[in-house]
Amino acid sequence: MRKLLPLLLFVACATQQAPPPPAAPALPAEPHGLTIEEEASILGLEDRREHDAATIGAWVAHPNPQHRLRIALALGRIGAITKTGVPELATLSKDSDRRVRETAAFSLGEIGLGAETLFALAADSDAGVAAEAVEALSKLSADKSLLPRYLAIADNAATEGVRARAVRYLLRWDDDTASEAARRALGATSSAVRQEGAYALSRRPYAGARQELLLLMTDPNTLTRAYATTALGRIGDASAFDALRDALGDAHPWVRTNAAIAIGRLAEKSRDVLNADDLPRVFATAEDPDAGVRASMIDVLGYYAERNETARARLFQTLRNGTLWERELSAGAIAKHLPWSEASEVLTDLTPWQIVRVLEATAAMPHGVELRKHYAAHADPLVRANVLANIPETGADAEADIIRAALTDADVIVRAGAYERLGFTSDVPLQTLRDAVESERTAPMNDARLAAIAVIAKSDAPSLQPLVADPDPVVRRVAAEAVKAAAYTPLTVSRTPEEYAEIVRWSREPHTATIHMTRGNIELALLSQEAPVTAWNFAQLAKKKYFDNTSFMRVVPNFVIQGGDPRNDMNGGPGYAIRDEINLQKYTRGAVGMALSGPDTGGSQFFITHSPQPHLDGGYTIFGRVYDGMSGVVDQTERGDRVVTIAIDEHPPVADISISNVSLPLEVGPMTADRLLSRVPDYAQRKTDYVPDGTVLEMMKPYIHPGDHVEVYMGTWCSDSQREVPKFLRILDDLRAQYGVELPVQFVAVDRSKQQPAELIAGKHVEKVATFIYYRGDAELGRIVEHTQSPLFEDDLLTIVAK
């Protein structure tokens, strides 16, 4: 079944010698405070999607907040299918524990009900709870009557983080009124709000925001620039071309990648935006050090090649001498952009994936029919399946002979494609399809059977009623949706209580996975508490060597790399499906998610995000995070890169290290606040999320003297710095904005040995980072080293300045 989606190097920041090999982060031994049997029973309820009123009622009223927290999450997983649990979640929304309220909000969003409860939670005194409630409200966007109240939050929320979250998910409302609110957010003084406004507009084109988006192309925030670039490309106005061309020279590959894609969108609308004078920049970007940027430029090069011989020669050169991935993309670009009489001269001796790109590019072209006939009997099932996939729906009758011949193909994915295309012919043989539903029961994969069922559903859905009780859970779901069944059992549950207990015991220990590739290693921390069944399934497959000699068969620049398919064509799986374990984890950079083709269809395919992808939150199970290998391996991975093996628990865990920091850059030398916010992942969001105690800042104000200043020695690569420096940046902003106090600061980024830059760090005795040194004139008043002593950063700062 085709699965689609829509570095921190862990060393202690105090270490002065070269860091040891990376070790994975630890998790608490018993993070939920539940017995093995209790947790196992909840896993069983989730598997069965069973709303056991007695058990749920007891846990909702349980004196232990850990029980209430766990049942709040379970209600969302069960209710997403059964639409039950809303009253219980309404009760939990008033819980004294903020985590319970936050999870209740999340679960109501997963169910898609409980608007009034969510609006109440959106006004919660805890910003984290309120933000989660706002995100959940956006999942109720089918009810347009809720939009005015949602817009009030997006425009006026008092807490910056809550407003930013509301602005982010304006995209889900699919409404110009919501897009206009996103446009208004682009003018916010808050960097986080501007970023989320640009993100919302990057997901839905809105021409009314064009001018504001152009201004954001030079914003200091990398994500804001990247999102604005995509948004302008989706609008497709030629007036944005110069700004997009200039963005090819941006300092960050995310922006350059998005600029290349955006230029392609403009060129698709009108070739007149292209100018031969731009070719030096185009050629330079085609040799970018980032693999995703290079890949994204190939189609752009194809547009120029339509009119320019030099560009054409460059495209041919990439076909001959590029990497495997680049040669595949070049074949598609040549087939798409050049006359077939010329393209056919160079598109010879193609690999199967090159043929796939050519078939995709020529699907709607006159010569596409002949190409499909030529490749219909190709030896590789990847090619045969893509021949069928690229038959236009309106042209199925003309190629019915290819379709019918494929009905008896030896490969199940090819047969699936044949049944699917058969549904677009003028004379659909329903009996043939009904026979296939039965004959395909014994196939190693259910794709062909599902394809036949989907075609039957178009014209004879009632006949599928018996399949609502089919042994295959995915067949049950598809059939139930077709006949509008009120309820069905989502999964066949064959696990015993002892097996659930085994999963729980395993999940209570920290676990790691090492993806060994020819390109290098990717180190994962498995989120065995947040997604125990998914993480367990992944680990068991790895131990069975299931992933050996697979590849990352799908790479989308600045989005994801996807692997886990032994067929290496995005259609393979282990022959079974596991249920979703949607959780509160977010798709930030380096998140590891389970690829799906519908609810509860996960198996073995997984993906890793290059950059934040908030639209995936709450839709795909996150079961791991990269803690080493992002910049050096994930970012450079190309389609087809081989996975040698995946090893479980190859590295022992190390306690007290956060796994939320991914691929932090290593910079050395003087830094500015703007550069920190734009270059280091999560700094801007962490600054936004931190809310200093205003009374402490007010007390601090009279103690800050003229001539006071602070030197901050920090590591852009360091988790302690990433935790503490954004707090300090927020305090500086609030002192300036609310109390008119300017406190000069010098930021110095040091290397891991704390020896560089030698001229700035000499004599400072910096042994740990982050180190904040407060001076009055030339005299040091005190310093904050690595961790604050008080719960609030501003308390430690007040202690120093009040000396």
Where are these regions (language model features)?
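Cyclophilin-like peptidyl-prolyl cis-trans isomerases
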Residues: 413, 431, 438-661
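Amphipathic alpha-helical scaffolding segments comprising HEAT/armadillo-like alpha-solenoid repeats
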Residues: 24-26, 49-61, 80-94, 112-123, ...
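Non-catalytic, surface beta->alpha helical segment in thiol-disulfide oxidoreductase systems
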Residues: 777-803
